[in-house]
Amino acid sequence: MAMKLRLTRMGCKKRPFYRIVAMNSETRRDGRALEYLGYYNPMVDPAEIKVDGDKVRAWLARGAEPTDTVRALLQKAGV
């Protein structure tokens, strides 16, 4: 079972925000997440990124692979 750190879309039509979550790579995009790690809100200026660094490091230590987008967001957040 390959674990991924990825984004799930939340919010209403034309007003998205995203949760950064840990989930199985085979789970659908908005499926049940194993753990919520933070969020990303691109609708405010500047874009808001909040991440729990300890939880992210724990999942990376367990072998979870972040998607390219999540990797870029984590670098911006300084994790």
UniProtKB/Swiss-Prot annotation:
Q: Which SUPFAM superfamilies match?
A: Ribosomal protein S16
Question: Which of UniProt's keywords are assigned here?
Answer: Ribonucleoprotein, Ribosomal protein
Q: Name one GO molecular function term.
A: structural constituent of ribosome
Instruction: Extract the Pfam families matched here.
Output: Ribosomal_S16
Q: From the UniProt record, give one GO term of the biological process aspect.
A: translation
Specify the domain of life of the species encoding this protein. Bacteria
Cellular-component GO terms for this entry: cytoplasm; small ribosomal subunit
The similarity comment for this entry is: Belongs to the bacterial ribosomal protein bS16 family.
Q: Which HAMAP family match?
A: Ribosomal_bS16
Q: What is this protein called?
A: Small ribosomal subunit protein bS16
Q: Please name the source species.
A: Solidesulfovibrio magneticus (strain ATCC 700980 / DSM 13731 / RS-1)
